[in-house]
């Protein structure tokens, strides 16, 4: 058993615990399991982090799951290589750690459970008995760190190819290709890779036949148009009926979390745009907010309003593509061409403000890159006058079509309990009747100052209800944009804090000290104090978040990117078993995902 109480700064730790003793769940844990078996880490995440020994993991999970106000959703699960982390004297001894991020809907609060591990004992019990969505998260943690989860139903690689060697998020695994031998794919290696892609049903617990039927196995993807990206689903079929299926991801993996370890806090911003490549500035927001927490930077009001305005423009842009491609998947072509015309109007506005279109990389640590250009309000007003009438066209000509309704209502249904079990967020969760929208429940960037409604469904999430939720969300985003237009404050667009990156040019030209700071922050990167922070936002496809660990350097020690599309695809088999292939196509169109968001 690992000693959870660090030897240094014991007085400080007791003082910190006393300051946070009003948190009832911490008291409940300490009372039930004993203070000597739990260590409370104080961070800037905004929720308690409790370190426990791995022998208590399942019991602690059950305890939190069965509280009167339970922690019902496993939001995230991943690992950290602690071996070269600086300034961790106040933490339990660990070579690696695994964290379990849980959410209580009734409390509207989170808790993170951390388990320290030594390098010679990287074994944990699986969490899949409590939370079925732990399956993929544990597979990815093994894939990236080599941590074994006992009794996992299928602990195999999920992001990297089955032939891959090593665990990429370990600190001794180089992030640069120049440190490896040049890649060469000879015929023998190519055969090996092709063999690795062959689907073997027995490895997934599937039978090739039963007493009466010999099943057919069909590859849908990884380049099928209805797969919406480089994504493969292997279907076990009895005729047209889906007996079971296995989603296969990882084809779009780019090592986004690894890249964060070799980019400065500032230079990583362009990479965030490409996590969910349709979201643009929406992707930048949780990252810069998390860095600002670490740096203790307060953002000017004008910058907050600009960030909200840009986020809602990209939300509408993404939703329009989703709605039109959903209609196309059901069989209607025309709306997708109209949608691209409407999205062009949004891109014209975004380009006028940021100078770029899909990936502006425009938010900054402490604000935004530039002030709004002259005439931005005219372009925005023209769009606000145009879009509501256009949205009615989509509804009346396509979404009220009896064939579309028949093909999507009652298809791929799940309820609130099932959604929470699988970590579903966004429109899929709200269609079950739960109005969990981070902008309302946990406001950020000034969203508490805006008037808007959260569209919800009647209790069952199906393909039709999910798409109609998105339609209503466009109306609400238009209402938020109108408030931004009418109430845009004056003042600076960037904080004057010394850690704001880059510093304002006006200050740089005034004194040599600011010039030196500017030079260091642009060339070397800002030095962010050691701590941990977390920020979730309501992104275009659900909840997106960044969990950052700084050890006092110019680069992140660990960047964990939790995206909504990853759990949404994991849920597919539980929803679609017993349905037809044609139903799967409609279901995939109703999820709203892109593979860059899944694979990172």
From Swiss-Prot:
The keyword Metal-binding does not apply. InterPro entries: NADH_DH_suC (IPR010218), NADH_DH_suCD (IPR023062), NADH_Q_OxRdtase_suD (IPR001135), NADH_quin_OxRdtase_su_C/D-like (IPR037232), NADH_UbQ_OxRdtase_30kDa_su (IPR001268), NADH_UbQ_OxRdtase_49kDa_CS (IPR014029), NDH1_su_D/H (IPR022885), NiFe-Hase_large (IPR029014). GO terms for molecular function: NAD binding; NADH dehydrogenase (ubiquinone) activity; NADH:ubiquinone reductase (non-electrogenic) activity; quinone binding. Residues 1-190 are annotated as: NADH dehydrogenase I subunit C. It is found in: Cell membrane. Its EC number is 7.1.1.-. It is a peripheral membrane protein. Pfam families: Complex1_30kDa, Complex1_49kDa. It is an enzyme of class 7 (translocase). The keyword Chloroplast does not apply. NDH-1 is composed of 13 different subunits. Subunits NuoB, CD, E, F, and G constitute the peripheral sector of the complex. NDH-1 shuttles electrons from NADH, via FMN and iron-sulfur (Fe-S) centers, to quinones in the respiratory chain. The immediate electron acceptor for the enzyme in this species is believed to be ubiquinone. Couples the redox reaction to proton translocation (for every two electrons transferred, four hydrogen ions are translocated across the cytoplasmic membrane), and thus conserves the redox energy in a proton gradient. This is NADH-quinone oxidoreductase subunit C/D. It comes from Buchnera aphidicola subsp. Acyrthosiphon pisum (strain Tuc7). The lineage of its organism: Bacteria, Pseudomonadati, Pseudomonadota, Gammaproteobacteria, Enterobacterales.
